[in-house]
Amino acid sequence: MTVLKRLNINKFTSEADNDAFIEELKQMWLAWNETSIATKISVDINKDRNDPTRMTAFVTASDDDAISAMNKWSKNVVMPVRDKYQHENIMIDAELVASVSK
């Protein structure tokens, strides 16, 4: 089974903006109700421990349909909210090649 990963790294100009966006992002993900992909996608939202102005959103999806649906939703819902804050963004799309647990 293919596992797709998307890592979004956002760096804001203040911790307050970062905290505000994290809260808004949590609420947007909780409110998103795309039943056709609900079991195919998840997100981990993290605040950087060393830089309080930086956060990550790590999306895991089981197929391209889930990523496509998320892309459409993100473009219409998430990005307009994020773009009201001054920020830098790095986005990495990847396919999981190994998972090691010890």
Where are the regions a protein language model picked out?
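Short, well-ordered beta-strand segments in beta-rich or mixed alpha/beta enzyme
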Residues: 4-11, 41-74
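A periodicity- and composition-biased signal for non-globular, repetitive helical segments
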Residues: 11-12, 88
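Short amphipathic alpha-helical segments
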Residues: 15-42, 74-82
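Serine/threonine-rich low-complexity intrinsically disordered regions
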Residues: 17, 35-36, 62, 68, ...
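Short acidic, gly/pro-rich beta-turn/loop elements at beta-sheet edges
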Residues: 18-20, 67-69, 101-102
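Glycine-rich beta-strand-turn "strand-cap" elements at beta-sheet edges
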Residues: 36-56, 78-102
